[in-house]
Structure formats: C-alpha cells, structure tokens
C-alpha cells in the first residue's frame, strides 16, 4: 500500500486528485531555505552582534545551518498543509538537511552540511540510474512532473537526470574541498540553481518530442 505522504507517479493521478502549490509559492518554498542559508552565513556576524544569544551557536556557518534547518521544516510544513502530500525530492532532501545539519551543530564540524548536496545528488542519481538498470524509469516518482511522456521519453529523460545528479555531486565535492566556506555557500545558492535551470531548459526538445497527446495518454 502506498503511503499518503509520498506523491505517486504524476501520470497515475487525475487532475481532480492533484492539489498543487501555486508556482510562485512553490518556487519560494524551494529557494527560501537556500536564501536563508546564504544570507545567514553572509550576515552571521552582524546577526550575532545584534542578537548575542545567537553567538552560542557558533560561527556564521553554524548559525546558517541552524536557520537552514528551521526554514526547511517550515517550507515542508507549508507544502504539506496546502497539498497533504510531500514530493519525494524535497522530502528526502529535507531529511538529509536535518540529519547532516544536526551532525554539523552537534560536532561543530561544517563538513557534514557541506557533504549534504553530495549525498542527496548521489542518492537520486543512483536511484534513477539503478532503476534504468532494472528496466524502470523512476523520474516521475522523483519529480512532481506535470507532463506526460512515452516510455522512450521517460527512459531518455531519466538517464539524463541521473547523470546530471551525479555531475552535481562531483561538482559539490570539488568546490567544498578546494574553496572557502563562503565560496561554497555562494556557489550552492547562485551556481547550482542557474546550472539546473539551464539543464532543465535543454531538456525541452526531448520533452516536446516524446510528449503524449490527451488521446494517447488515455489510450496508454
């Protein structure tokens, strides 16, 4: 039996079953925690000066981690309150944020929060590529997609996203291991998002080529 928290494959749901978050709010819920993380790290010393109690958390990166965790929980709660479902990707990412964020604060070691993107991207990349190995295109379960594709389209798109996730994991490892914390935080917020947007736009020809019409979708 499928757990109600998890979203099913979008192709299996009718429009009446879907309770979607408005696009702008959805974008805000996805970007909000990252922006909190960036500005808390960039302005951490100022925040600590203004609110001395925050100094007990530690350096700006630790304050940013704590606020990132709080913002992530709030974003998931808002999404749940509006749709009564949690898409797989934000849910898994949120769980990893809480686990690795807690380790970061407990051990006072920012390595854990820096490895979070590596873990999440490797996990999703492994799931997608592993699914293809067993003949399953699992992209519909990872993303809350609104489009319908034929089987070949799902396979190709799943392969591309699986490889892209692995690419992001490798890039994150290179950046956090070779550059300063501030550079890594900036790249995480202002580098990964543009790269992802460009990659997504590059998939539009494939999506258009393999999109199903309403008649084809009903017949399938």
Swiss-Prot record:
Keyword Glycosyltransferase carried by entry: no
Protein's UniProt keywords contain Transferase: no
Localisation per UniProt entry: Cell inner membrane
Keywords: Cell inner membrane, Cell membrane, Membrane, Transmembrane, Transmembrane helix
One GO CC term, this protein: plasma membrane
InterPro entries in UniProt: YciB
TM helices/strands, residue ranges: 20-40, 57-77, 86-106, 123-143, 156-176, 187-207
Top-level division of the source organism's lineage: Bacteria
One Pfam entry name: IspA
Membrane topology recorded in Swiss-Prot or TrEMBL: Multi-pass membrane protein
Function as written in the Swiss-Prot or TrEMBL entry: Plays a role in cell envelope biogenesis, maintenance of cell envelope integrity and membrane homeostasis.
Family designation: Belongs to the YciB family.
Designated name of the protein: Inner membrane-spanning protein YciB
Organism (species): Brucella canis (strain ATCC 23365 / NCTC 10854 / RM-666)
């Amino acid at each position: 039996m499928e757990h109600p928290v998890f979203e099913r494959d979008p192709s299996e749901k009718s429009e009446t079953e879907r309770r979607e978050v408005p696009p702008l709010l959805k974008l805000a819920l996805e970007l909000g925690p990252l922006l909190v993380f960036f500005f808390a790290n960039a302005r951490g010393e100022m925040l600590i000066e203004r609110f001395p109690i925050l100094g007990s958390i530690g350096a700006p990166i630790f304050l940013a981690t704590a606020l990132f965790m709080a913002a992530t929980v709030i974003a998931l709660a808002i999404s749940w309150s509006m749709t009564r479902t949690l898409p797989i990707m934000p849910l898994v990412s949120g769980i990893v944020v809480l686990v690795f964020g807690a380790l970061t604060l407990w051990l006072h070691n920012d390595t854990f929060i820096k490895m979070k993107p590596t873990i999440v991207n490797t996990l999703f990349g492994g799931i997608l590529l592993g699914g293809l190995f067993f003949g399953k295109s699992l992209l519909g379960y990872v993303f809350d997609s609104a489009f319908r594709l034929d089987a070949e389209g799902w396979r190709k798109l799943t392969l591309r996203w699986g490889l892209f996730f692995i690419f992001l994991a490798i890039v994150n490892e290179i950046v956090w291991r070779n550059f300063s914390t501030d550079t890594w935080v900036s790249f995480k917020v202002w580098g990964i998002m543009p790269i992802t947007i460009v990659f997504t736009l590059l998939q539009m020809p494939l999506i258009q080529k393999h999109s199903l019409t309403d008649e084809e979708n009903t017949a399938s």
